[in-house]
From Swiss-Prot:
Cofactor list: Mg(2+)
Name under which the protein is recorded: Nucleoside triphosphatase NudI
Species classification: Bacteria, Pseudomonadati, Pseudomonadota, Gammaproteobacteria, Enterobacterales
Gene name of the encoded protein: nudI
Protein family membership: Belongs to the Nudix hydrolase family. NudI subfamily.
EC supergroup of this enzyme: hydrolase
EC number: 3.6.1.9, 3.6.1.12, 3.6.1.-, 3.6.1.23
Family annotation (PROSITE patterns): NUDIX (PS51462), NUDIX_BOX (PS00893)
Residue span(s) of domain Nudix hydrolase: 1-141
UniProt-listed Pfam families: NUDIX (PF00293)
Transcription recorded as keyword: no
Length: 141
């Protein structure tokens, strides 16, 4: 089984949290709402990976004013590829508290949509299992 270290930013702006809706045809949680994030590449430093993933998935214009390590956990997940193949992966999640100066997001092809959501409204979204655990641990659900 392959192992991946995943960096996940929990991005907040003026009391709203950024959620991204995963593309329906790929990923570990197709069609569900999630935090952005992705895998650390070989010899890449953790914060470099976090900033790269944010740029790739959310665009160059989103400005983070605060990044702090918050929590970690592990899990085993099944990833579905665009061609329908599936792979079981051991995931190590490194979760960061982030604050953004703006809400200027441009999503890539990994996502179908995004939303800035008030804490009290997070429960109304079809959150994937990993995001639900993260937001519960944070006291937001």
């Amino acid at each position: 089984m392959r192992q991946r270290t995943i960096v996940c930013p929990l991005i907040q702006n003026e009391g709203h949290y950024l959620l991204c809706k995963m593309a329906a045809d790929r990923g570990v949680f197709p069609g569900q709402w999630a935090l952005s994030g992705g895998g650390v590449e070989p010899v890449e430093r953790i914060e470099e990976a976090l900033r790269r993933e944010i740029r790739e998935e959310l665009g160059e214009k989103l400005i983070l004013t605060h990044i702090a390590p918050w929590s970690f956990r592990d899990d085993t997940r099944v990833k579905t590829y665009p061609d329908g193949r599936q792979e079981t992966i051991y995931m190590i999640y490194l979760i960061f508290d982030c604050v953004s100066a703006n809400r200027d997001v441009t999503i890539n092809e990994e996502f179908d949509d995004y939303a800035w959501v008030k804490a009290e409204d997070l429960k109304n979204y079809d959150l994937n299992a990993a995001t639900r655990v993260t937001l519960s641990q944070k006291g937001l659900l």
